[in-house]
Structure formats: structure tokens, C-alpha cells
């Protein structure tokens, strides 16, 4: 697999934000309140019954076997999610710095109200903003924010978060580039994982043959 080198701009400038560093010279920064609003749509009355979950940085439909024991009435306390909503797990930043905390919804459904649900506003791309928040998550920048004993995040943190004032077309181009390249990387990872699984299988066969048959597989064996 060959990855195309990411196109670069001709000139950059200091963003004025220490953790952002330099940005393209024609990009500007605005507070997150221009890009995000907080979604608080209650599922009171069971408007939706498809239960979603944030798992490894993706919003997935929760498998039926994971719903065993849950009382349907409890889903009335969940919040409604729509495609392009960005879901954030905001709790316990201090003690958990390994889990992926952001996910982009592709389905209609409901999710626990313990999560923050961000709706993208105006001329902003949900895919681009999710990649942006995902980058802040994986580089641990997101852990600079938050408050309280366990450093929980809130919508206020995202209202203050610096976001880029760039055209929708630029955002879409970046998101499309990342969709393509990350899909290629995921495919390469899957191939490598298959190769590793085959090598591990060969290793186990080799060990089993060596310890039970000796080093010469042509030597006649006798019943143990």
C-alpha cells in the first residue's frame, strides 16, 4: 500500500494556540460555539428504540445479546441520536486516558444520557469536525480541558474550543482525503492481522510437532 503525501499549503502562520502550532496562513480561528450546539433530545415516550453504543471510537448499534437484563422503560432516560451527531464520553478523564472518547453517528437511535451529544451548526462538516475532535482525543489534547475531581468535560469546554473558520469545501476535501486514506490503512491492517494469525498458527503447529515427534518428522512413531 502506498500512501499519497498529504498536500501542503504554501505558507503557514502561528495559530496563537500553543497546542495547535502553525496553521495555513488563510485559516482563522473561532470559538467552538459557532460550530457546535448541545443536543438534548429526550427519549421520553420511547420515540426511538434502537440502542446505540460508543465502541472503539465508533457509534454502533448495540447487539441484542448486550441488551439482556435491561429494562425497556430505562430507555426513556436515554437521549435521541441522529446521523452526523458527534458523541463524546466526557467522564473520568483523570483515570481513563486510553479509551477513545469520540464517535460520529451514522444511524438514528438512542444512547445513554451520560454522553454529550454535539450537533454541528452552520456551514460546518460533521465528518471534518469529528476528525478534528478525534485528533484532539488521540493526541491527548482533550485531557487539558475538563473540570471537577475527575476532570469531566462539558458542553462549555466545547463552546470555548478553538475551531477553524474555513470553507465547507475545504472541510469536505480534508474529510474525503482522510476517509480514503484511513480506509486504505484499515485494509492494510486487516491483511497484516490475517498474516499474523497464519504465522501464529504455523508457530503452534511447529511447536506441537517438535515436542511430540522430535526434530525428524520421518522417524517412525510408536503408540504412546
Regions of interest found by a model, annotated:
Residues 11-43, 160, 168, 172, ...:
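Non-catalytic DNA-recognition/assembly elements of restriction-modification systems
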Residues 79, 83-138, 144, 154:
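A short beta-sheet element
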Amino acid at each position: 500500500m502506498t500512501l499519497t503525501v498529504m498536500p501542503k499549503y504554501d505558507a503557514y502562520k502561528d495559530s496563537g494556540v500553543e497546542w495547535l502550532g502553525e496553521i495555513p496562513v488563510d485559516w482563522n480561528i473561532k470559538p467552538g460555539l459557532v460550530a457546535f450546539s448541545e443536543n438534548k433530545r429526550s427519549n421520553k415516550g420511547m420515540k426511538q428504540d434502537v440502542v446505540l453504543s460508543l465502541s472503539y471510537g465508533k457509534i454502533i448499534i448495540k447487539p441484542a445479546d448486550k441488551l439482556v437484563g435491561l429494562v425497556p422503560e430505562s430507555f426513556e432516560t436515554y437521549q435521541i441520536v441522529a446521523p452526523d451527531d458527534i458523541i463524546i464520553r466526557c467522564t473520568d478523564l483523570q483515570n481513563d486516558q486510553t479509551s477513545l472518547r469520540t464517535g460520529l453517528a451514522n444511524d438514528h437511535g438512542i444512547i445513554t444520557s451520560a454522553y454529550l451529544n454535539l450537533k454541528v451548526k452552520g456551514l460546518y462538516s460533521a465528518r471534518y469536525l469529528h476528525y478534528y475532535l478525534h485528533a484532539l482525543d488521540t493526541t491527548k489534547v482533550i485531557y487539558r480541558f475538563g473540570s471537577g475531581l475527575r476532570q469531566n468535560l462539558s458542553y462549555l469546554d466545547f463552546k470555548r474550543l478553538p475551531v477553524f473558520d474555513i470553507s465547507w469545501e475545504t472541510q469536505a476535501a480534508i474529510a474525503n482525503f482522510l476517509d480514503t486514506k484511513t480506509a486504505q490503512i484499515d485494509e492494510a491492517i486487516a491483511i497484516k492481522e490475517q498474516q499474523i494469525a497464519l504465522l501464529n498458527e504455523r508457530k503452534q503447529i511447529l511447536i506441537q510437532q517438535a515436542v511430540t515427534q522430535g526434530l525428524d518428522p520421518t522417524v517412525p512413531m510408536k503408540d504412546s
